[in-house]
Amino acid sequence: VITSLTSSEDSYDSDTIHNTMMKYFGVSADTVDIIYINNNDEREHLGSYVPLEQIGTKTFSCALVAPTTKGGIQVKTANLSWVTCNMIASTLSTSGVTNCQVVAASPFEVSGTGALTGVIMAYETASDVTLDEEKKDLANEELVTTGNLADTVGQSKATAVINETKLQVIENNITDISEITNIVNNISNDYDVTISDDQSE
């Protein structure tokens, strides 16, 4: 298995953080491909979707990504306050990934947008596969919708509503906007969640 590690390059003490996270992940420089992520990368990849207060001005979180051949998408996180396991798994799934192991973490609590930025980049490097750009954009939009909805209804309900909606739309091959809106409204009602018109879109 080829594994990729994303690491911060613009934090106040990047070498210390890098070494700390290498030990945490149990890897060394000769066993992984290392991709360095900085705050500009975060803003470039997530700036159109994620509030800048979540992105911040420094990158601290890292991700260890290992493509697999079975087992689905498995994600673990540590010290991430905004990015969740479900958000990372959903981002990978919507981007076209079916099997992968991810550990996303930071030496102290941060939002996790640095790790999130690097996950797709690391997967593409480790698997030598370039994922579809439209799917990656859709994954980012979905991520923000889930995050914003979670702010009002909680992470578990937000994830359930988004995932169930996505499942029904895909399984039934629905493309009509009004039908999708009805599905969103019905699922939201099932979970006793109120969704604004903007969130529904």
Where are the language model's segments positioned?
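N-terminal, leucine/charged-rich tether regions that mediate assembly and partner docking
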Residues: 1-101, 125
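Soluble oligomerization/assembly scaffold segments of membrane-associated complexes
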Residues: 93, 101-198
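Residue-level signal for protein termini and structural transition zones
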Residues: 2-15, 184, 192-201
